Regions:
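His/Asp/Glu-enriched, well-ordered alpha-helical/loop segment
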Residues: 6-29, 33, 39, 43, ...
């Protein structure tokens, strides 16, 4: 777990050193939260085979509070998903539940719009496409947990954990993504929740 650039620097140095002393291909070391990494830290994490797990939900819930503590300029780099995409560095989006609600659509919406609940936009240059954000809560999340062979996409032989949404997040207005209703949830192909 590392939030600020100082903590992320310590973790990055540790991963670099570990890979020098005990090289491990495909280690998939993680930096949980990873809220304020610099571009160069993301480059170094990639080189060390490490990945960010962005805790982006606070930007939606408490963007103004973060800006009050560290300034709007720094909040503009909060969970820089676009930089990670540009580097070809897979990442996931997580909620740190119960800190923020377990609602991947809020995470997707926040990564795409970079907008707080009060309507403030922070770091629009770090916004990503809807598809990129969806990958962060599906196939990339599975990959970072060494579960891409059983989760993260709908492929024969995988668990068939999925949701049926009332609307297509790829076609609705980006700010509406967080409001899309979940009609059904499937685990292992079985319905475990139905909105009916």
């Amino acid at each position: 777990h590392a939030n600020g650039d100082g903590g992320i620097e310590i973790v990055t140095q540790a991963y670099e050193r570990l890979q020098q002393l005990h090289p491990r291909p495909n280690a998939r070391h993680l930096v949980i939260h990873c809220q304020y990494p610099s571009y160069s830290q993301l480059q170094r994490l990639k080189a060390a085979g490490a990945y960010p797990c962005f805790f982006i939900s606070p930007l939606c819930h408490w963007g103004e509070i973060h800006a009050g503590y560290v300034g709007a300029d720094r909040v503009a780099r909060f969970c820089p998903c676009h930089d990670a995409d540009e580097l070809g560095l897979p990442y996931n989006l997580h909620t740190d539940a119960p800190i923020t609600p377990v609602d991947p659509l809020i995470q997707v919406c926040t990564a795409v719009t970079r907008t707080s609940r009060k309507g403030t936009v922070y770091g629009p240059d770090q916004a990503v496409t809807v598809m990129s954000a969806l990958k962060a809560v599906t196939i990339h999340a599975a990959f970072l947990n060494f579960e891409e062979h059983v989760k993260g996409s709908l492929t024969p032989g995988k668990y068939a954990d999925m949701v049926l949404l009332a609307e297509n997040p790829l076609t609705v207005a980006p700010e509406h993504i967080k409001d899309i209703a979940v009609l059904r949830t499937y685990v292992g192909g079985d319905v475990v929740y139905s909105r009916s």
